[in-house]
């Protein structure tokens, strides 16, 4: 009887220790140390307020440029597309399997209005990301501010304005899978991770609102 009780106790202990551990960031506060830029710089902003995180970048004013070009007869460009990024260091061991889920709202997708899911972030010039516009999703690797690898998958979105999406990044120790609304968009094999930095970026006249994130260590 005693041996049976010990065996049952051991099974229960193993079950508890093998359970996935999750952390939910609801953005009621900056609990993970996200990099914020509360003022609107000439590149954009990243702000946590009222339970969401909002990332904005700036874009070329094509309408104003067209008017000035027509008036002057000289090709005139007003403004420029900017890149803006925010990140934190996730409560994960990236050497082991994990998944990250983000509930987001996107203002609009276009060829020059992009948003991205950043991970394996070491610093501003060294990171991986899944990024997409209205036509494609890319997996891109940056090393010392240079693109050293890129995989592209064409995608046709049902809507391109005011999108509500759920992004999911799944890593099993070798394979990275990126899902949008439970649909697998891109899979990358034999990819090892080293850094727990994770975040988002926008490019062009883009606004990305992150409502909630769930980090799960499997």
Mark where each language-model region is.
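Extracellular carbohydrate-recognition regions
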Residues: 20-43
